[in-house]
Amino acid sequence: MVGELRYREFRVPLGPGLHAYPDELIRQRVGHDGHPEYQIRWLILRRGDEGDGGSGQVDCKAEHILLWMSKDEIYANCHKMLGEDGQVIGPSQESTGEVGALDKSVLEEMETDVKSLIQRALRQLEECVGTIPPAPLLHTVHVLSAYASIEPLTGVFKDPRVLDLLMHMLSSPDYQIRWSAGRMIQALSSHDAGEGQCGEEGKAGEELGRLRDSQDTVAGASDLIRTRTQILLSLSQQEAIEKHLDFDSRCALLALFAQATLSEHPMSFEGIQLPQVPGRVLFSLVKRYLHVTSLLDQLNDSAAEPGAQNTSAPEEWSGERGQLELEFSMAMGTLISELVQAIRWDQASDRPRSSARSPGSIFQPQLADVSPGLPATQAQPSFRRSRHFRPRSEFASGNTYALYVRDTLQPGMRVRMLDEYEEISAGDEGEFRQSNNGVPPVQVLWESTGRTYWVHWHMLEILGFEEDIEDMVEADEYQGAVASRVLGRALPAWRWRPMTELYAVPYVLPEDEDSEECEHLTLAEWWELLFFIKKLDGPDHQEVLQILQENLDGEILDDEILAELAVPIELAQDLLLTLPQRLNDSALRDLINCHVYKKYGPEALAGNPAYPSLLEAQEDVLLEAQAQAKDSEDAAKVEAKEPPSQSPNTPLQRLVEGYGPAGKILLDLEQALSSEGTQENKVKPLLLQLQRQPQPFLALMQSLDTPETNRTLHLTVLRILKQLVDFPEALLLPWHEAVDACMACLRSPNTDREVLQELIFFLHRLTSVSRDYAVVLNQLGARDAISKALEKHLGKLELAQELRDMVFKCEKHAHLYRELITNILGGCIQMVLGQIEDHRRTHRPINIPFFDVFLRYLCQGSSVEVKEDKCWEKVEVSSNPHRASKLTDRNPKTYWESNGSAGSRYITLHMRQGILIRQLTLLVASEDSSYMPARVVVCGGDSTSSLHTELNSVNVMPSASRVILLENLTRFWPIIQIRIKRCQQGGIDTRIRGLETLGPKPTFWPVFREQLCRHTRLFYMVRAQAWSQDMAEDRRSLLHLSSRLNGALRQEQNFADRFLPDNEAAQALGKTCWEALVSPVVQNITSPDEDGISPLGWLLDQYLECQEAVFNPQSRGPAFFSRVRRLTHLLVHVEPCEAPPPVVATPRPKGRNRSHDWSSLATRGLPSSIMRNLTRCRRAVVEKQVNNFLTSSWRDDDFVPRYCEHFNILQNSSSELFGPRAAFLLALQNGCAGALLKLPFLKAAHVSEQFARHIDQQIQGSRIGGAQEMERLAQLQQCLQAVLIFSGLEIATTFEHYYQHYMADRLLGVVSSWLEGAVLEQIGPCFPNRLPQQMLQSLSTSKELQRQFHVYQLQQLDQELLKLEDTEKKIQVGHGASGKEHKSEKEEEAGAAAAVDVAEGEEEEEENEDLYYEGAMPEVSVLVLSRHCWPVASICHTLNPRTCLPSYLRGTLNRYSNFYNKSQSHPALERGSQRRLQWTWLGWAELQFGNQTLHVSTVQMWLLLYLNDLKAVSVESLLALSGLSADMLNQAIGPLTSSRGPLDLHEQKDIPGGVLKIRDGSKEPRSRWDIVRLIPPQTYLQAEGEEGRNLEKRRNLLNCLIVRILKAHGDEGLHIDQLVCLVLEAWQKGPCPPRGLVSSLGKGSACSSTDVLSCILHLLGKGTLRRHDDRPQVLSYAVPVTVMEPHTESLNPGSSGPNPPLTFHTVQIRSRGVPYASCTATQSFSTFR
């Protein structure tokens, strides 16, 4: 039958392709908080199971989870389950109408018939005791079964006599009676809730939980008999029921139980070898299980009705519930104890366990301490490694890692040895030299030996080159400076975590422990101790109670008081020392493994001197108990090794000598069985001792599994065992635990025939007495073993045929037993998960004894995995078997190559018993060409002759290296064959590089992990949605999210610390909890609503707006900020591991949102998605804040300081909320960038100009010195951090333009160049064209030229002096050599020569005129500025030194021109064939005026020097003389005529512009300042002015060119590099750019690729251009765009002419010596510098 899948739209993802759907309401109760809770059944379906139609049909046996939910959780997750009145809709009651279908009178008649039939059947049963049941009895029972199937008659069967009737029928020796009882029970159970819809009539029916699905309780035999489970419970709890049930009756009840639990917990334990459990033990487990479930039902039903707890006094009700909880805990502990013993987990306790849990958060991944191949003794914290290379632990197999090492390793790299190999030890380091195709293939120079040695690829760990290697300790603490370019400095070298004082593991400080509670056991510890006290027999139990009474003031202890007793720790320690001597062997093993014993037992008392004697006795008992198992196994081995002739003792005596003192029981038993007369009185006490301590008995049976030479021992043992079977008490011994030894002896081909015959006799006798052991033998494969023994001995084994037939008849029972142990184990797991859920919901501790033991056994093996060589027994190949080992040598260089015809290429794997392949991979190489496989088929079978099942077929790509053949097999195949059907390029032979086989984890951990994670994920996803609903309705509830999350996560942390045994289990729980709870919550609180605001974004906005109240204790601010910080610290607790594809946030409506989407949570549930959502929300908040600030304050004069302060607040808040994490610093940067990108172009240009001006002011002000200078530098640093946001944005181009102008002004003035360099080093990425860097570089080039010019001047001076000396010498020589008579003639000749020299020197007079200047020679520095990077405005006219400079300055400039023209190569200057200098008015000078030093510009210097010769000069004449514009001249005159200046401007009507005169110092006092700065401030056009509009016009021109070019190329588009080239070419050729625009830009027609790329980014952002998905580097035109065309009338299209001069130069004039001072009263100006 199938049922309709309702509420299919409310699905919760539980894993890949796995979803949970709410199905129906099961029951309700009052929760711990007084509010009603509802148990909802959630169906678990895989993808495709829910059907394709609108309403899927699902099987009622589908997996499900029962989850208690509050009304708010139901509303948030499946609101359709609420009716119109707001109440939860219960299960449908469609069958209630059937009651009215029967007439009342007819119904009464039928009820009378049923009562009479019950009475008649009881009477007939009593009459036929011991005889064959008559036919009327069978007919009566048949009619009763028919009546039982009618639901309206269910009430009649409340009669307690029905239970007596069923009991007698099930106890009847007749099969037909027992069969009829089963039919009647099935008829009664057909009325289970939902059976009519989902059950299958006459078959197994519903699950065990239908008892829990009802509102009734089961208190005794007289309760309602409504379901099969209730009947089983009532029957199984009858005293001495096992005495009344034979094998068939017990199997009938077990079959009913198996049918009842068929769909309760359909867990698959396939691949896990479950032990053989006899029916007697199974029936006991069923009784325990039914008792536990009934108590659990009573606990749930005790609060089913809201008014239930008001029917009696609160204290009485609480006491009743507390007693019920105690009974449930004791029953659950007993069930766990028996289940652990039945599955023999306790016998595996001495096996190596996985490493204990390391302390730490379960929500953060644990880092491996050492490499897998490195022994622990050699692990050193100073090992070095490189962060760039992957360790071996990250790879699934050795072959994969070997391929990675082979492809990555380069000669010269450092490597470390991971394994011991011949002469090289693990941990040795060396340098990789070379590799080849040999074996081993890798040559390494090892430091330990000083020479090279060859090893294998998989043995090496790559460290990298020497410069890449870092210390491991530092690497663990270091976190890379990812955001260094954001802040201009590296992050701290420590890894940030929440402060230990505030956030202890896991997150918050644990609750304060009560000092009084610390002195007593917790309730869970006391109940665990009470469990063992209740296990004691009568006298021992009373003695322990007497001890408790004496230490607790003699209080009378009843069950109610015992449940709530506060036991001091000292008393508990005394009890733990007393109990071991009073418990039996089974209970003692439980005591040793329990939590309270480990915490307060002898190990805890080892340091207490008050217990020395008790500890000694305790240790003796424990050592004896723990050593019995090992001694029993070793005893048989000792017997096998010692020859019989060496000892006169019998074989049995030698066996017990190896066992110890407890072996005396076996000797006494042998003696008692060998004696004549009555043996029962002697044997029975010994059997009771063996029941209490079964280890000697197990050792006796295990001795059969010894070598065949121990024939005498085997015969003796079999004789004893055969005699023991006849005693009823012996059947209570654990025969099933040692039947394996019998099977080993039966299967051994060397077993002696007499021994084999005795073994057959013994097994036949054992199975005849108890058919349970025939079932156990069937499970162990005894039928085949007996058949082989009969074949060997030609059928001459007595009773062997009968034994084989008996074993064969138990095939159905063996299947039933396997099903039962699976169902019981699955049911226990479900109850454990239910207790964990209640623990989560109620926050009450788990008080069940052995709860941690059960979880430890379920989680054991979590770190164990079947390795390759453990999966298969041998590997066979079709040909070349001597090379088969190359398939598994983990060396990718070697291979197996076939040798034969096509179709005969195969590899055969003989798998180990029970191994299910998790992954089978074939390694190939594309370099093998035609030898590489092309098609591979995998077949499976039971033998090599039956490989008929094709498991998979794979087509291999030519480029493949790893071919996965099989994955996650669900069936065991003894033989698996890999057939290479075809090779690449039609090749015949094939080459296989390797074979990888991964097996499953053969433990219960994968099953339990799946169930634990499913329940955890469903619970927390439901809770996350409910919390998200609250926060959507009221954003203020977001402030409580931190406390909610802290409570949930701390509870999971405490649970893992208390109950989970290892890191893998704890990490699985933590990861699931985090993904199910935190990830959805973060997704919901970061998703914007219809107004575009997310709850977390609103909270962060509030945090920023109220920053001023952070430290005001009088306000409510500190508490608010603390909650916000705790929330954000918690949400970023887990670091991102991987980056899945981004999820686009979709707006969601406000208020109570009834529709939600869980569909994407399967991929969003990762830590990295949390970080992505948080950073996205943080970016939106920052963008909103910055955008509001820019909109309101962009015109303000103090815009930049306020912006920097605002940015600093955002930066500090990011550190406060999220710590120095690069992701959130990047979100801050992106948020600011997003706000800047929204600015219109003119506003953006104005903002960039403001930033450039502010930086200029801070740099200029840093010259002040002192504290103000430090303050200025701090403000400058803060501004630079904010400016870094411009990097990569379109605004960077405009910012570079303005910064270039301000920087040029500073560099031409008195500013430190080192500060300029430091600023450029920090904000260099903000200059796409790198023009400021080039300007700074040109300064250094000019300094080098100045140094060379200085040397050049000295050379010229030396040459002039040398000429003068030669001239004087010639004159002197001419006078001395001539006679007096020729004196006049020779004087004329000498004079003529001198005249010639003077004539020749006239050409150089202009250059050398300052050589004979008598005053102080000024120092002149020349800056050669490249027009390529220096901005020179059009108002900066050229300077004519001949007319505007005095002679002593003019000569220096002329000499520099000659020097520059003569120079052949100058680095970093503009390349070109012609280099000419053109002097400009740019620059500055120092003049001496009286006692003042004036800092003036070059124009001002010329004007002041010009006044040295004139008393007054008109402005009009100055304009005519200099050729300057009126604006530039007036700008220079302004400071000179100010109050600090030396000139006065007199306005005259007849003289335009006025007359300049030197200010008379006698009329007004002259300033006493030593240095007066008169350089006029540089004024630039505002962004709103002509320059900003010109920049916008240029951008629009480029946009037009880009759009037109892409339109011409259509949809095919252009590569971005080609597009840039075409745009630059069009810009140069014209008709763009118009000359008017060019001249107004002031930089000529220069247009760089950076300008074009900036425009391309702008158009991409606007959607005008688009990228191709498959080729992102190709751009094409997308949609029409409105581009501002340049106005022709404002651009002067008709203007023409040559480009401006190529290079501009400026002068700096400095002087040497004492300044020249005029002696006259009139002050004059002298050039000082």
UniProtKB/Swiss-Prot annotation:
It is found in: Cytoplasm; Cytoplasm, Cytoskeleton, Microtubule organizing center, Centrosome; Cytoplasm, Perinuclear region; Golgi apparatus. The modification Phosphoserine is found at residue 371. Pfam families: ANAPC10, ARM_CUL7_CUL9, Cul7, CUL7_CUL9_N, Cullin. Residues 350-388, 632-654, 1373-1405 are annotated as: Disordered. There is a cross-link at residue 1607 (Glycyl lysine isopeptide (Lys-Gly) (interchain with G-Cter in NEDD8)). GO terms for molecular function: ubiquitin protein ligase binding. Residues 632-642 have a biased composition (Basic and acidic residues). PROSITE patterns: CULLIN_2, DOC. Pathway: Protein modification; protein ubiquitination. Keywords: Cytoplasm, Cytoskeleton, Golgi apparatus, Isopeptide bond, Phosphoprotein, Ubl conjugation, Ubl conjugation pathway. Residues 392-465 form the CPH domain. Residues 845-1024 form the DOC domain. The keyword Cytoplasm applies. Component of the 3M complex, composed of core components CUL7, CCDC8 and OBSL1. Component of the Cul7-RING(FBXW8) complex consisting of CUL7, RBX1, SKP1 and FBXW8. Within the Cul7-RING(FBXW8) complex interacts with FBXW8 and RBX1, but not with SKP1. Interacts with CUL1 (via the C-terminal domain); the interaction seems to be mediated by FBXW8; it is likely specific to FBXW8, but not other F-box proteins. Belongs to the cullin family. Core component of the 3M and Cul7-RING(FBXW8) complexes, which mediate the ubiquitination and subsequent proteasomal degradation of target proteins. Core component of the 3M complex, a complex required to regulate microtubule dynamics and genome integrity. It is unclear how the 3M complex regulates microtubules, it could act by controlling the level of a microtubule stabilizer. The Cul7-RING(FBXW8) complex alone lacks ubiquitination activity and does not promote polyubiquitination and proteasomal degradation of p53/TP53. The CPH domain is essential for interaction with p53/TP53. This is Cullin-7. It comes from Pongo abelii (Sumatran orangutan). The gene is CUL7.
